Design a protein with these regions (language model features):
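A polyanion-binding, active-site-adjacent surface
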Residues: 22-178
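Residue-identity detector for glycine
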Residues: 7-9, 13-18
Length: 178
């Protein structure tokens, strides 16, 4: 399971079901459990749980921060303005959206599209951890600061490190025009 800081809210420990329970679920069971989740306050105002979308054998997984208004209404990640930008970027690198799996750090929309709180991320951590375990992607692409802080490093600064490829390869990829 991912390393999450414990906080207040409705998810006092590793979750109401326990880590072992989550790690035994298949895709359909995981999604069914997630759709009825009440582990944090975001559940109170959501229209839909935004579980994730894409082939469940994809080699590439994109992880965003959380659903926006359009995503909450449609129950699918990256269908609003962010989805249009993602589609444009995927087209530029000749990557077919139907070949990737897309999920978010949290499965319900934070109010006013604010960043997900640490407690909300923690409440959703079991869902995301199991999605990653089931998918077993070759590559995880972080979309935004919140996911980069969890998967790359806690003090990740997107304005400073957005063009860096983490790891020991020593490679750099330019992501903006100079």
């Amino acid at each position: 399971m991912l390393d999450w800081h414990k906080g207040g809210g409705r998810a006092p420990g590793p979750g109401s079901f326990g880590v072992r329970f989550f790690m035994m679920l298949n895709w359909n069971e995981l999604e069914a459990q997630c759709l009825s989740c009440q582990k944090c306050a975001l559940a109170d105002k959501r229209t839909n749980v935004v579980f994730g979308v894409g082939p469940r054998d994809a080699e590439v997984m994109f992880i965003g921060e959380g659903p926006g208004e359009n995503e909450d209404l449609q129950g699918e990640p990256f269908v609003g303005r962010g989805g249009k930008l993602l589609d444009d970027m995927l087209e530029l690198i000749d990557l077919d959206r139907t070949k990737i799996y897309i999920a978010n750090m949290v499965k319900c929309r934070p109010p006013k599209n604010r960043d997900p709180l640490e407690t909300e991320q923690y409440a959703c951590s079991e869902w995301l951890s199991r999605q990653i375990a089931l998918l077993d992607p070759k590559l995880i692409v972080c979309l935004g600061r919140i996911s980069a802080m969890k998967f790359i490093k806690p003090d990740f600064k997107i304005t400073r490190e957005h063009a860096e490829l983490p790891g020991k390869t020593g490679r750099r990829m330019e992501t903006k025009q100079r």
